[in-house]
A protein has these predicted regions:
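PLP-dependent amino-acid enzyme catalytic core
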Residues: 1-346
Length: 346
């Protein structure tokens, strides 16, 4: 929407934007179709997948700053030097209205929604969606969702002073300050804003992938994360969740899925103390085989100083069906006379 509003003179100058999320790719792809030169400045912690896609779309990508605000300072310098047209990721009415078209399509398909959870970074998406939603249905509830690591809107909305962290799995919404234009709209139209834990975001990403076969990045999974933490989870009301963005590094995704298996005890590591004599490991492996439990890794140590010189410690990683299955194998190993502890990474 913003690109289409540019004059021919502005198009010839080329555009520049700072973003760690979907805004960058929207600009890059739009410029590719319209024949406009695009420069994108992204923070240092931007996933390689997002960087690569912008390059593939033909944009000139510059990595600068530890967050979007620092990236914006570099953008301003480049605008002054090269006279680029700056396209702000959220504090721009044309961008806000463009993002609001998402809600128009959403409510055309689901007109009876009573409540919608919307991810919040700088406030572009939620302000645009709120304008459309409230015009179509003034009774619909709009709830903004942020990670507790970046409570920008929450602090402005409720006049609190919650602290910020340096990183989040939802890097696409890692914004330290809500746009002025966005905040004005949000305070008028948004009903509530909530914060969610990083672990809930991880769980939401896993649920999207495993249940819906849909890859959603951290920022896009905020809505479902909020629903998981809310009492609304058990209600039968028509509730909507905006899932936006599917750019997640393969390494991060694999780590996230493994962490979710650990939370569910489908993968667990046990520390087992035993006498240092033949046949001990065999007893445990036979028990695992009988219970259809897969052994993923084994570490056998005779040099643990808190044990007797005639004892050994076995650290064994197992794959189970669920928590009930995991607890069963722990109890069965204890019945064999072994001292068992579950190793939990905090």
């Amino acid at each position: 929407n913003k690109l289409l509003s540019l004059t021919e003179i502005q198009k010839k100058k080329g555009v520049i934007a700072m973003s760690a999320g979907n805004h960058a790719q929207g600009i890059s792809l739009g410029c590719k179709y319209l024949g406009i030169k695009a420069t994108i400045v992204m923070p240092n912690n931007t996933p390689f997948e997002k960087i690569r896609k912008n390059i593939d779309y033909g944009a000139n990508v510059i990595i600068h700053g530890n967050n979007v605000l620092e990236s914006e300072k570099h953008v301003n310098k480049l605008v002054e030097k090269y006279d680029f047209v700056k396209i702000h990721p959220f504090n721009d009415y044309d961008v806000i209205y463009g993002q609001g078209t998402l809600m128009l399509e959403f409510l055309q398909k689901h007109p009876n929604l009573k409540k919608i959870y919307i991810p919040v970074g700088g406030g572009g998406l939620i302000s645009g969606c709120a304008i459309v939603a409230k015009n179509l249905n003034k009774n619909i509830k709009i709830i903004g969702v942020e990670t507790e690591n970046f409570p920008s809107l929450y602090n402005s909305f409720y006049k609190t002073k919650k602290s910020f962290e340096k990183s989040t799995i939802a890097e696409g919404v890692a914004v330290n300050k809500i746009g002025k234009k966005n905040l004005k709209i949000i305070k008028e139209l948004v009903d509530e804003t909530v914060l969610v834990k990083e672990s809930s975001i991880e769980q939401a990403i896993s649920m999207f992938l495993l249940n819906d076969k849909t890859l959603v990045e951290g920022a896009g999974a905020l809505g479902l994360a909020a629903l998981l933490e809310s009492k609304d989870r058990n209600k039968r009301d028509d509730i909507g969740v905006i899932a936006c963005g599917g750019n997640l590094d393969s390494r991060v995704l694999s780590s996230l899925l493994m962490r979710e298996l650990v939370r569910k005890k489908q993968v667990l590591t046990l520390s087992i103390d035993m006498e240092d004599k033949p046949g001990q490991l065999s007893e445990i492996s036979k028990l695992c085989s009988m219970e259809k439990i897969n052994i993923l890794a084994v570490e056998h140590s005779r040099f643990t100083l808190d044990l007797s010189v005639r004892a050994a410690r076995l650290n064994i990683t197992l794959e189970t069906q669920d928590k009930k299955h995991a607890n069963k194998i722990i109890n069965l190993i204890k019945k064999l006379g072994f001292k068992v502890r579950e190793k939990i990474e905090n």
